Amino acid sequence: MENRKNYFHLHLVSDSTGETLIAAGRAAAAQFQSSHALEHVYPLIRNKKQLMQVLDAIDGAPGIVLYTIVDRELAGMIDQRCREIGVPCVSVLDPIIELFQSYLGSPSRRRSGAQHVMDADYFARIEALNFTMDHDDGQMPADFNEADVVLIGVSRTSKTPTSIYLANRGIKTANIPIVPGVPLPDGLLRATKPLVVGLIASADRLSQVRQHRVLGTTQSFHGEEYTDRAAISEELKYARTLCARNNWPLIDVTRRSIEETAAAIVALRPRLR
């Protein structure tokens, strides 16, 4: 089928926060680089009045409709209206729920936002986020042994965003910059509980990212060495040596997304799952 246009409307209708839909929609849209998705997100849609406004908006800008609505009547309204105006729609969770029901031999609860219940896991995530923010960029090294994971790496290896992503999964994460000539904190070297992981990237990639950082800030950096490929190569050599000396695993983040890096870290220690 030929490409219709260089953009399309993507309607994401949810009875909860919409996070599941946004992730699924973006993952699918990313496979079609020739067309740009114009996202329309409708969270917390739980009654007919709210849904009618959404359906009118879809009618005004037809496109692909993805939804996670557990109320069967509301879901039926979406299906019917989409058929009437001739747009495709998919209930993202239904095939998964049906698979679970078939395998487990029991019906689902059909409860909106069930994944966001304020249970023990929720409070564990909040605790992990607080810990991670308090221990960003080498802060509070004395209690690194309370961490589940400690990330170390030279500048611009995505330590902070990866730490936050892990914290959102309930994993307490600290991160420390590796700077040649600057010793790591004693608190890290004494810690026995956390998984310590080194993050590296190619010198070319780091030079490019650092150049963008320098251009986008008034912050002072250490001269041309910060972006110089040869100097960066020496930083990376030091980081590799440091990790090898302490038997810490290394992950190259050059071609990895934050999510892929986090998955690789979790795979190193199954109990983090």
UniProtKB/Swiss-Prot annotation:
It comes from the Bacteria. The keyword Nucleotide-binding applies. It holds the Pfam family Kinase-PPPase. The keyword Kinase applies. One of its GO terms (molecular function) is phosphotransferase activity, phosphate group as acceptor. Its EC number is 2.7.11.32, 2.7.4.27. It is an enzyme of class 2 (transferase). Keywords: Kinase, Nucleotide-binding, Serine/threonine-protein kinase, Transferase. It catalyses: N(tele)-phospho-L-histidyl/L-threonyl-[pyruvate, phosphate dikinase] + ADP = N(tele)-phospho-L-histidyl/O-phospho-L-threonyl-[pyruvate, phosphate dikinase] + AMP + H(+); N(tele)-phospho-L-histidyl/O-phospho-L-threonyl-[pyruvate, phosphate dikinase] + phosphate + H(+) = N(tele)-phospho-L-histidyl/L-threonyl-[pyruvate, phosphate dikinase] + diphosphate. Disulfide bonds: none annotated. ADP binds at G153, V154, S155, R156, T157, S158, K159, T160. Belongs to the pyruvate, phosphate/water dikinase regulatory protein family. PDRP subfamily. PANTHER family: PYRUVATE, PHOSPHATE DIKINASE REGULATORY PROTEIN 1, CHLOROPLASTIC. Bifunctional serine/threonine kinase and phosphorylase involved in the regulation of the pyruvate, phosphate dikinase (PPDK) by catalyzing its phosphorylation/dephosphorylation. This is Putative pyruvate, phosphate dikinase regulatory protein. It comes from Sinorhizobium fredii (strain NBRC 101917 / NGR234).
